[in-house]
Curated annotation (Swiss-Prot):
It comes from Papio hamadryas. This is Cytochrome c oxidase subunit 7C, mitochondrial. The chain crosses the membrane at residues 34-60. It is found in: Mitochondrion inner membrane. The lineage of its organism: Eukaryota, Metazoa, Chordata, Craniata, Vertebrata. Pathway: Energy metabolism; oxidative phosphorylation. It holds the Pfam family COX7C. One of its GO terms (biological process) is mitochondrial electron transport, cytochrome c to oxygen. Belongs to the cytochrome c oxidase VIIc family.
Length: 63
């Protein structure tokens, strides 16, 4: 009895929830402004790429 009511509740919750669909709608950031996206992605990936080099430079200058 309890299992049936739980199963009905979870399926009704899934059925009632609706999200926008389509390209770019399931991302946690906006892709509408391509220049803002370019700046954000360049900072994100650029900082990840530069971090090891900056750490090595810091270690070499420390000696």
């Amino acid at each position: 009895m309890l299992g049936h009511s739980i199963r009905r509740f979870t399926t009704s919750v899934v059925r009632r929830s609706h999200y926008e669909e389509g390209p770019g709608k399931n991302l946690p950031f906006s892709v509408k402004n391509k220049w803002a996206l370019l700046v954000k992605m360049s900072l994100y990936f650029g900082s990840a790429f530069a971090t090891p080099f900056l750490i090595v430079r810091h270690q070499l200058l420390k000696q």
